[in-house]
Amino acid sequence: MVLLLTLGYPMTTAKLKAMFSNSRLTAAATGTLILSLIPHQEPRFLLPCIPLLLTCVRLPSTADWRRYFWISWIIFNAALGLLMGVYHQGGIIPAQLALPALIQHTHPSVSHADVFWWKTYPPPTYLLGDHGPGADLEIASVNSMGMPQSELLQTISLALEKHGAPCSGASLIPSFLRTQKDFYIAAPLSAWRSGKPFDPQDLSFVTDRPALNLTHLATFPKHINLDDMDFGEEGVYNTLARVVGRRGLGVWRVGRSCPP
């Protein structure tokens, strides 16, 4: 849009009439305006407007401006290609492929494991291979993408009470009714709010039940979570420092801190 406005400078009535008599430009501008008025729309919904807008762009006529145009075009596409093609949600597939080995290395005797995928897209489950129902190691992917942090921790705490090793050595649920499970969290490093300087190796949280300890197993560094940016609350600098500075997708095993 900025490029189109620049090409229309100076904004005379004749130029504006000529621009908006273009049906492709009018369709793209109208669609962008309508979608922009509706809250919680994602940028990808505007993708159909891009081909329409590109057909309305006239390349600069002078050699210098034409050179600037192509330089900026190459830089823009290289930067967006790196961001969206490598880093945007880029740790999901490597993490999903590595999970069976991570779980078996951490707890070789476990037969059931639930992995909570939090603040990230749910991964393709077929990448787990033969770890579905009935396998020696059954891995279930739990979609927790939109959960608040407190709700996620409470949910896992309840699940640990039901399926984890009891703190007291005894449980209200008879052993023959208990399915022993391990619980894991796969989440962007930037998603955690811990109230102290962030260290993926030292994460613990207090819930209404015994405190939770998170044992860090792995980090997949080529991952940026663009869906957890809050410029209104944190400001531009703090948001970018958190999302870009703490880039990466981590995997943690969740356990309880039982009182002595």
Role assignments for model-derived ranges:
Residues 1-19, 32:
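Hydrophobic, aromatic-rich transmembrane alpha-helices
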Residues 3, 30-56, 99, 181-189:
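C-terminal, well-structured subdomains that either form a transmembrane helix-short loop-helix hairpin
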Residues 4, 24-33, 49-61, 68-79:
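Hydrophobic alpha-helical cores of multi-pass transmembrane domains in eukaryotic membrane proteins
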Residues 10, 16, 39-42, 54, ...:
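Short amphipathic alpha-helical interaction elements and helix-loop-helix interfaces
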Residues 15-25, 66-67:
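Membrane-interfacial loop-to-transmembrane alpha-helix junctions, especially the N-terminal start
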Residues 22, 26, 35-50, 63, ...:
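Membrane-interface catalytic loops of GT-C/OST-like multi-pass glycosylation enzymes that act
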Residues 63-250:
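Catalytic lumenal/periplasmic loop and adjoining terminal transmembrane helix
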Residues 249-260:
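C-terminal helix/juxtamembrane-tail motif
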